[in-house]
Amino acid sequence: MSQRAHPYMANSVAAIKRAMLDEIGAGSIAELFEQIPADHRLARPLNLPPALPSEAALRRHLLDALSKNKSCEEHLSFLGAGCWPHHVPAICDEIVGRSEFLTPVWGTPSSDHGRNQAWFEFASLLGELIGMEFVGLPVYSYGCAAGHAIRMAARLTGRREVLVSASLDPERLAVIRTYCEPEAVPSHIKVVRVAYDRATHRLDMADLKAKLGPRTAAVYVETPNYLGAIESEAGEIARLARAAGAETIVGVDPISLGVLAPPGDYGADIVVGTTQPLGVHMNCGGGVGGFIATRDEERYAREYPTLNISIAETLGEGQYGFGLTLAHQTSYGMREQGKDWTGNSVYLWAIANAVYMSLLGPEGFREVGRLILQRSHYAARALARVPGVRVPVAGGFFKEFVVD
């Protein structure tokens, strides 16, 4: 056992390590890893450079490494496909950085009313934006939200097949397949890909009709989709799914809803999407989140895997309280017997989302949506004039488009 203490790790003091090992009845740290086969363990010390001698040297080293980064703050960026460098108003960062919210402490179901109220505002504002009444607290990502929604639909219908567009983001499709589980698992859900029209990048309606049937639990469609196209026949897709006894799950970019119709208006049963455009920075793989929303009906509410926030009158006249509801049916309440499994890694972003939505309001969303439409179509026309560059679908998109 090393006798050298690490300056930033109190438990690295040799006497403390010895006391902890004695408490658990272990003779050495190596004994803690005996369950790992010997041929899977590294039998030599790690080849690490010499330790930096001081905090000042560590700071210089980190600043030197960070100076090599290239960010979207200093370069024109066309990054997208699920994570975008939208402007984040300073007030979003200010509020989520406050000590009332930026804390590892988790309140009980009926305490912590300030944070609970902020979460309630997130749910109610997002519900108004997407045209739905019941919005759960966010999950890890857009893909996780889609996976959970498909599992909800399978439980609701008792069917084990979902139709998705062949144009779906490959990474999101991989997450969905993971949620639908391997074929050997009894709760496996078969993922069937529906062709898309190469001329418009929209779902091929003929192929959808051919594959929609009595085994279909849900049709999952995104608008705008991964290739950027707006699914102009989303209402007809919902009608066909309903006629087949299937649920319609619609995935959206919420920032598009200042100019596009909310999914609730054209027949969506379950709505999912990303929360990242709503006041959250791109952040090295972080900063993402997904939401799930439905109508406020018992059959849907009982299938939510997420934590949910509700409002109730109190004994004080005109006063209201905010707290968790339906927690017993989640993995928080029932553990392995819960409807599904989720975590709380993006709840802070829900507060940033609420601040962003309240700051913009309906007119702000319309303004942002129109600006995105104007700039994306301007960019498409400008790129199409470049020799050797082709934009195969020149219209019918919101923010993103394909370039050959």
Language-model regions, residue ranges each:
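TRNA-binding/sensing appendages of the translation machinery
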Residues: 26-40, 268-273
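Short acidic-aromatic active-site loops that bind/stabilize oxyanions
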Residues: 109-119, 139-140, 224-227, 369
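N-terminal entrance/gating region of PLP-dependent enzymes' catalytic architecture
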Residues: 15, 34-121, 127
